[in-house]
């Protein structure tokens, strides 16, 4: 199992940060590696919502569909892949820190298979860099 965990403090109230980060319409706005993202069914910040998306990583297009399986309004959510090149679970948590909000992105993915398994450390490093960059972009947008 491969794990990426990144955190950032955004100087905005927790509810505003959570609403921005978990709104499916905003994902392509702050995620430079996401080339397509659409709400397929359900409500955007409700359990059962399903989104289809395409991410570009290490020069490859990876198609995914995930379902929001847990939500605690203003605090966090959990997403589980339904159909993905690399199966994963993702948890996003928001907590108060002083006048701002700490956002923690925790994602667990299956290892690449077969011949490509040796690329796991490289893919993990590239993806962690994308997550850090995306959280930084969300911070810039929200604080401007």
Residue ranges and their predicted role:
Residues 3-5, 61-65, 86-91:
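Short, surface-exposed coil-to-beta transition loops
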Residues 12, 29, 63, 129-133:
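Generic recognition of short, well-ordered alpha-helical interface segments
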Residues 15-18, 132, 136:
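Amphipathic alpha-helical segments that line or abut small-molecule/effector binding pockets
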Residues 38-84, 97-102, 133-144:
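Glycine-rich portal/gate segments that line the openings of hydrophobic small-molecule binding cavities
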Residues 1-40, 46:
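Hydrophobic ligand-binding cavity/cleft-lining segments
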Residues 10, 55, 107-109:
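Hydrophobic beta-strand positions in extracellular immunoglobulin-like domains
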Residues 80-133:
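Beta-strand/loop substructures that line and gate deep hydrophobic ligand-binding cavities in soluble
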